[in-house]
């Protein structure tokens, strides 16, 4: 289960890295935070809630 989540996060990080190269540095940081924060929050709440 955790391996699947880690693989999924790695793929999303790679996608985010590719997008960062195309965008402005400041804008890309905000986009990564917007995309990553809900994933981490859901992961933690799922692990702590069960």
Curated annotation (Swiss-Prot):
<feature type="propeptide">
    <location>
        <begin position="11"/>
        <end position="35"/>
    </location>
</feature>
<keyword id="KW-0964">Secreted</keyword>
<protein>
    <recommendedName>
        <fullName>Temporin-SHb</fullName>
    </recommendedName>
</protein>
<keyword id="KW-0027">Amidation</keyword>
<dbReference type="Pfam" id="PF03032">
    <property type="entry name" value="FSAP_sig_propep"/>
</dbReference>
<dbReference type="GO" id="GO:0005576">
    <property type="term" value="C:extracellular region"/>
</dbReference>
<comment type="similarity">
    <text>Belongs to the frog skin active peptide (FSAP) family. Temporin subfamily.</text>
</comment>
<keyword id="KW-0165">Cleavage on pair of basic residues</keyword>
<feature type="compositionally biased region" description="Acidic residues">
    <location>
        <begin position="14"/>
        <end position="30"/>
    </location>
</feature>
<feature type="signal peptide">
    <location>
        <begin position="1"/>
        <end position="10"/>
    </location>
</feature>
<feature type="modified residue" description="Leucine amide">
    <location>
        <position position="48"/>
    </location>
</feature>
<feature type="region of interest" description="Disordered">
    <location>
        <begin position="12"/>
        <end position="31"/>
    </location>
</feature>
<keyword id="KW-0732">Signal</keyword>
<comment type="function">
    <text>Amphipathic alpha-helical peptide with no antimicrobial activity. Does not display anti-leishmania activity. Does not show hemolytic activity (LC(50)&gt;116 uM).</text>
</comment>
<dbReference type="InterPro" id="IPR004275">
    <property type="entry name" value="Frog_antimicrobial_propeptide"/>
</dbReference>
